[in-house]
Amino acid sequence: MATTTGAKRGIWPMIRRIAASDRISGLIMLGFALAGLVLANLPLTAHAFEAVAETHVFIPHTNLDLPIGHWAQDGLLTIFFLTVGLELKQELTTGSLANPKAAAVPMLCAVGGMITPPILFLATTALFSQFGPGEPGSLILATTGSSIPFAEMSHGWAVPTATDIAFSLAVLALFAKALPGSIRAFLMTLATVDDLLAIILIAVFFSSVNAWYWFIGIAVCAVVWAHLVRLKKVPWIAVGVVGILAWIMMFEAGIHPTLAGVLVGLLTPARVMHGEYSPRAERYADKLKPFSALLALPIFALFATGVHFESMSPLLLLSPLVIALIVALVVGKPLGIIVTAWLATHVGGLKMAKGLRVRDMIPAAVACGIGFTVSFLIASLAYTNQELSAEARFGVLVASLIAAAISGVLLSRQSKRFEQAAAVAAAEADAESDVNTHSDELAEHSITLADGTESVEIDFRR
């Protein structure tokens, strides 16, 4: 019995350590994303994978009758958004966003990084619609050869706006061991604001409001949640019920239900209360991290990329939609971030963290082109045409891998330069310390000799 108990005690801390590692959890999600693409297109597994993804699960007395693939997107992903909401609340209260002046540059960069990709996406697709192989004003899908009007393809303008914070930090952890913490803090702040803006995009552009009375229920759930999580002893069963009710009411109201997680997360206290050792928002986010990073995100990625292509070939890389997403994420994201940073510091008079220059942010800005989670979600919401949705998710996957590879190379080189600079600075500091020590010894020797007392002590130090 003791052995079993010890094993259980050892397994959960290990799971939490894995979930806390941006590098490992990011690689796990990438593995599931690639597995979904393979399983959906291998002849031996495609039928079984589709059967599982399309199996419907319903909740009685509601309109909730969704296939498992949609439950992963609308249900499990709520855990991720709850974690995001809790982290946002903590950052807004005591973290990097608590002081707007200090966070001004990365906050503005997040806005710039969300404006530029849609512009490049629309410009690229517009060029293909005018000068591509199809009729003017339309584009050709690589998988089926069918013609899609530019107006319909332009619905995906929001797909390349989001940054996947988990993958971006995973790339930093893999390739940037010697970088100063200010670069990671900059990326964290930028990605946090990016998440907030992406949530607003989903709420405004990809929700269709139904009956207004559901909003009364959502408001009641919000008030009850805010009260319950402030009690000295939190009634977890009641909290869980309120959270589920808020999710159902969001769904019934026509708002994307994952936003229920953000709502209740933002209502959770982010300051220490009742004599506790840490804020509740921080603790709850820490406890939810394993479920978010190792359950919700991998399963979502599995089904999000698990789209079947009739003709899986390298021609997919020549799809106008895929190329537009690559340009938007790999070029547009870093371009928007760097240009905004330059304007903010050189024109706006704002300052970056001490020791950081705008060009130091280029590798991290390229890492912001890694889309994945929220981009997959927006691709599913933006296109009702399944062929377009499939190509969009494939484009996000390819663009994210390219951005990760480029940023990995740039971060590795930058890390070596910082490491060399740190070594030179350390050597100079040691040399200066030796000189100062030698000077002190000589001064002590001369002062002792100049002492007129009978007892003279001379200390010769080598």
UniProtKB/Swiss-Prot annotation:
PANTHER family: NA(+)_H(+) ANTIPORTER NHAA, SODIUM ION/PROTON ANTIPORTER NHAA-RELATED. This is Na(+)/H(+) antiporter NhaA. It is a multi-pass membrane protein. Na(+)/H(+) antiporter that extrudes sodium in exchange for external protons. One of its GO terms (cellular component) is plasma membrane. It catalyses: Na(+)(in) + 2 H(+)(out) = Na(+)(out) + 2 H(+)(in). The gene is nhaA. Keywords: Antiport, Cell membrane, Ion transport, Membrane, Sodium, Sodium transport, Transmembrane, Transmembrane helix, Transport. Its main location: membrane. The keyword rRNA-binding does not apply. The chain crosses the membrane at residues 24-44, 66-86, 102-122, 156-176, 196-216, 235-255, 256-275, 290-310, 312-332, 361-381, 392-412. The keyword Ion transport applies. Belongs to the NhaA Na(+)/H(+) (TC 2.A.33) antiporter family. It comes from the Bacteria. GO terms for biological process: regulation of pH. GO terms for molecular function: sodium:proton antiporter activity. It is found in: Cell membrane.
